């Protein structure tokens, strides 16, 4: 009986992995890439460029939408709590821009966008460090499996933000400095495929199994 049971479990896992690339998720990813293109084009319009606060607000809103959209692709939207999760993902993708004001020591938007160097949360080396630290903290606090997706949510929110910023500034990889700016279409491609990469990594680490139990169904993203 053990062999058929194990085979059934492995078959279910394989099906869950294949569902990561379902038709619905691929359409959602294509929509995410299209949104990036349209939103970035909108940001270049003169009435946006001539108002610093408006430009910063819209740019930050785009970061938030990309973050929540990406996480929605990962987990799917099946019940009310899923919407709370994607909103949190959008918030995390957006809130890191507050470090501009921290670095500027002022609420002046002009000072915040004209810093001598990049603020701390824009160091890409911090992403794996923060995600791993959060995972260790959750383990130390013995949090329930229902919280197991938090490090991955943080990963996709921060990474999507950094990749988008990388078009203009490259990635800041401490202690090695900045990379060359990321080409625009590479940024769009990475952003659209990042949810699927995240899903595969979650599958390989067993996180998707715990989330499927939490959601009560096999996740189809």
UniProtKB/Swiss-Prot annotation:
It comes from the Eukaryota. InterPro entries: TMEM267. Keywords: Membrane, Transmembrane, Transmembrane helix. It is a multi-pass membrane protein. GO terms for cellular component: membrane. It is found in: Membrane. Disulfide bonds: none annotated. The chain crosses the membrane at residues 28-48, 57-77, 86-106, 121-141, 182-204. This is Transmembrane protein 267. It comes from Danio rerio (Zebrafish). The gene is tmem267.
């Amino acid at each position: 009986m053990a062999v058929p049971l194990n085979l059934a479990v492995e078959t279910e896992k394989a099906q869950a992995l294949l569902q990561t690339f379902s038709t619905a998720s691929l359409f959602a990813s294509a929509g995410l890439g299209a949104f990036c293109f349209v939103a970035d084009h909108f940001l270049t319009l003169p009435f946006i460029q001539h108002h610093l606060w408006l430009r910063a607000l819209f740019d930050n809103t785009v970061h938030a939408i990309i973050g929540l959209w990406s996480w929605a692709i990962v987990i799917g939207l099946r019940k009310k709590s899923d919407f709370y999760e994607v909103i949190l993902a959008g918030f995390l993708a957006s809130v890191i821009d507050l470090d501009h004001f921290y670095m500027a020591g002022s609420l002046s938007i002009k000072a915040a966008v004209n810093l001598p160097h990049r603020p701390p949360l824009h160091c890409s080396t911090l992403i794996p460090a923060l995600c791993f630290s959060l995972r260790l903290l959750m383990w130390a606090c013995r949090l329930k499996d229902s919280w197991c997706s938090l490090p991955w949510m943080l990963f996709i929110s921060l990474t999507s933000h950094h990749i988008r910023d990388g078009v203009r500034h490259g990635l800041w990889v401490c202690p090695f400095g900045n990379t060359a700016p990321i080409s625009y279409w590479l940024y769009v491609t990475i952003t659209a495929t990042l949810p699927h990469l995240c899903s595969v990594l979650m599958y390989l680490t067993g996180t998707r199994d715990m989330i499927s139990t939490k959601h009560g169904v096999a996740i189809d993203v």
